[in-house]
């Protein structure tokens, strides 16, 4: 059976990290994706203790960034905390344009240079970095890396210790998606696969993601792409949604598990 991971963001509004861990382990889910700001709310000592008592492991650690000149000093502390939680990979949040910045090519070069510096630190600490391209409509304010093609090229230029995560919400539209997933797979760079859905209409680009099966994304088709490219990792549920956040977290996780088991089956 396909391994299912829940990203804490899916239920974070009504379940703190300790509650989230308990809800997952009660449902037989032993791997989670976590957030540094949620760790801070409950305390790192307690979070680590509960995680270890439950025998759980961490897939993704969210996150380092935004990658601005004044934030790079904080990056190493986040990487070190991710290492203490033994996260499989750490997400890079590039951020968008800086004040008075309008040249996209220059902004992207700035971010690429910053990623190189972060990678140097990550290698020393012993954690992997993950680039997750975000939808082009959030390029200006959230992420200057908008395509899997760009992410792959950055990884190729920088070498070991960095890979990509495919989030269907951000990549489903890309006509090069199959080719770029294959490219990442051939290089052993596919670190994660995130699922949710794109609703019609979408009321908010950040906080109106759908539960799998409620929207228009060809989820089975994209899952087949990552599997064919050699990805054997988990299916990770990451849903930013004011609708789902308002519901009982246990119910949300139960529905997510049921949808994943229906849609995604290991080949």
Language model regions located:
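Histidine-acidic metal/acid-base catalytic patches
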Residues: 1-5, 10-28, 80-87, 145-166, ...
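Active-site mouth loops of central-metabolism enzymes
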Residues: 3-16, 63-72, 101-107
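Active-site-proximal loop/turn and secondary-structure-junction residues that shape catalytic pockets
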Residues: 10-12, 36-40, 64-67, 94-98, ...
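N-terminal substrate-binding region of glycoside hydrolase catalytic domains
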Residues: 21-42, 62-67
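Glycine-rich, proline-tolerant flexible connector loops at the mouths of alpha/beta enzymes
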Residues: 33-53, 98, 102-103, 138-139
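Alpha-helix-loop-beta-strand connector modules within alpha/beta enzyme cores
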Residues: 47-64, 112-124, 149-158, 217-224
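Active-site acidic/histidine proton-transfer and metal-coordination neighborhood
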Residues: 68-163, 173-174, 248-251
